[in-house]
Amino acid sequence: MKNSIKTMLSLAIAFVIYSPLAKAQNTPNSLNQPGYYHMALGDFEVIALSDGTTPQKLNELLTDAKPGEVEHLLKQHYQASTIECSVNAYLVKANGKLILIDAGTSDVYGPALGHITESLNKAGYKPEQIDAILLTHIHMDHIGGLMNGDKIAFPNATVYISKIEADYYLNPANKAKAVESAKRFFDGAEQKLRPILIAGKLRTFDFGGELFPGITPVAGFGHTPGHSFYAIESKGEKMLFLGDILVSDAVQLPEPSITSVYDYDAGQAATTRKKALAEAATAGYWVGVSHISFPGIGHIRADGKGYIWVPINYSASGRGQ
Ligand SMILES: [Zn+2]
């Protein structure tokens, strides 16, 4: 069990006082925004898909900060301590295949979220067309959309997840050992991932090779035991999907040591984040981030001891930047 006592305590306290993605937090709304954004990446196309937005109390969600530091950094970005947090997934068109990175929430978090299928339809695609789904990790805002009730939502897709992640969350013995507040992640895996496994549509991978030409999983551990990034590369252009290693650009870019109550191993998550940010800033490739303001695509630029977020420049054609 890698959780430090400190992490377990902070998780327990946070879940008792506040569950940021609780149904009661959501206000009824439909997805009034278009919910998709196209961009070309070499011969590939990336289409950001919005699952919706939901209020998040970042001053309670973010931990390992000095007193008042989170509020101060949010204020500098004209953000309140409770912000509308995006839940993004990404459709990659690569070599004739339609590959989804994460699957949104489905009906798990109420009407403000659960719009991936709607966004996919608006972008011109149907769930039956999806060939593969690459999961960054097994949390409900990333795997919820795999199932609609007891039906597989993307019936023709093979689902990919790191072996470490699947082995951890699909093992009841690990649930028995986990702190009470973390047991629901195992329940989520049983509800959303086990049926995919039973249907013979789950593929697990080790790191070190491509899943498809130009598409490579990269170890990004800490937020969960087997959390994965995905690198896509075409014609010299690259984008790295960072999952949940970065939750708030306003707070965790200037101070990458600040962690999240949802981190399985907060220390490891901080180390992974610092390495990923340094590499992205040095190499200058694109990044896609699940909870940065939609479409969550941009660049990371070094700024003093930290970094700043440079969002993608809007392009009506999706072919210019
Ligand atoms: Zn997430």
Which residues does each PLM region occupy?
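Bacterial N-terminal signal peptides that target proteins for export
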Residues: 1-9
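Bacterial N-terminal signal peptides
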Residues: 8-18
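Metallo-beta-lactamase
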Residues: 19-117, 121-125, 129-143, 163-219, 236-243, ...
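Active-site metal-binding loops of divalent metal-dependent hydrolases
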Residues: 51-52, 103-106, 138, 164-165, ...
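Short, conserved loop/helix-junction motifs that constitute active-site signature segments
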Residues: 150-156
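Cap/insert and terminal regions of metallo-dependent hydrolase folds
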Residues: 231, 235-321
